[in-house]
């Protein structure tokens, strides 16, 4: 399974480290020294660049919550458009609701398109090393182009029966967006759990070392008591 999952990374992930992590999860147990090497504190940086700020923003929890919220709203808008296309819900006489839904959905797509542009600018070539991000950007760009075409040629697509098919293409964007957001959140949780695990492992090692020292101290005191006849040899 790891040989497939290792390809689905997002920007900010180290592909080599990502592959190694899956192999370590399959083995389930690693030495404490190897765990220490997996988690490294970020080095102190004297000068914070715009790219650094944007990378921190893209990996922040609030940003992911906003993206998930926009994806859910987009899903509801596309669902509403599909229901009206299938005549399950009848729009108003002047067809204002479909246009409002379409413009709102196009606005959300514009936000996603800007996000993709900033990610390419911030991460550069690293962006194209992560297939999940590339797939997401392709779906966003294609969906944006199709929505623009539908905005001016909707009647032509409706006449040939392609309108519903194009709406369904947006579902691919929604599903991919949800998977990407959930995966990023999961990566953050895994990172936090690994940090907690490292702290606990360090604490256990300290306690074990302390126990060994206590046992050695007890043995030393026992020998001293026996030497001075304060403790019988049978004790």
Curated annotation (Swiss-Prot):
Ranges in a coiled coil: 187-228
Segments on the Cytoplasmic side according to the record's topology features: 1-62, 124-131, 181-235
Extracellular-side positions: 84-100, 153-159
GO biological process, one term: response to zinc ion
Membrane-crossing segments per the record: 63-83, 101-123, 132-152, 160-180
Pfam families tied to this protein: Ion_trans, VGPC1_C
Cellular-component GO terms for this entry: membrane; monoatomic ion channel complex; plasma membrane
Annotated compartments: Membrane; Cell membrane
SUPFAM superfamilies: Voltage-gated potassium channels (SSF81324)
Single GO MF descriptor: voltage-gated proton channel activity
Keywords: Cell membrane, Coiled coil, Ion channel, Ion transport, Membrane, Transmembrane, Transmembrane helix, Transport, Voltage-gated channel
Main location: membrane
Entry membrane topology: Multi-pass membrane protein
Protein purpose: Mediates the voltage-dependent proton permeability of excitable membranes. Forms a proton-selective channel through which protons may pass in accordance with their electrochemical gradient.
Assembly and oligomerization: Homodimer.
Family: Belongs to the hydrogen channel family.
Domain remark in the UniProt entry: The segment S4 is probably the voltage-sensor and is characterized by a series of positively charged amino acids at every third position. Unlike other voltage-gated ion channels it lacks the pore domain.
The protein, known as: Voltage-gated hydrogen channel 1
């Amino acid at each position: 399974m790891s040989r497939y999952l290792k390809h689905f990374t997002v920007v900010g992930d180290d592909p080599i480290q990502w592959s190694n992590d899956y192999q370590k999860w399959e083995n389930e147990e690693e030495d404490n020294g190897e765990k220490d090497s997996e988690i490294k504190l970020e080095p102190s940086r004297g000068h914070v660049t715009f790219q650094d700020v944007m990378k921190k923003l893209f990996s922040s929890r609030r940003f992911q919550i906003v993206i998930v919220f926009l994806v859910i709203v987009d899903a509801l808008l596309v669902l509403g458009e599909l229901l009206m296309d299938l005549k399950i819900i009848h729009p108003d006489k002047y067809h204002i609701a479909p246009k409002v839904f379409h413009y709102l959905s196009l606005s959300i797509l514009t936000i996603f398109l800007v996000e993709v542009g900033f990610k390419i600018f911030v991460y550069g070539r690293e962006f194209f090393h992560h297939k999940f991000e590339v797939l997401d950007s392709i779906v966003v760009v294609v969906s944006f182009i199709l929505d623009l075409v539908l905005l001016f040629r909707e009647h032509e697509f409706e006449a040939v029966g392609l309108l519903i098919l194009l709406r369904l293409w947006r579902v691919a964007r929604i599903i991919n967006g949800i998977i990407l957001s959930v995966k990023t959140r999961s990566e953050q949780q895994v990172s936090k759990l690994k940090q907690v695990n490292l702290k606990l492992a360090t604490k256990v090692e300290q306690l074990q070392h302390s126990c060994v020292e206590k046992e050695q101290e007890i043995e030393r005191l026992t020998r001293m008591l026996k030497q001075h006849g304060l403790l019988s040899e049978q004790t």
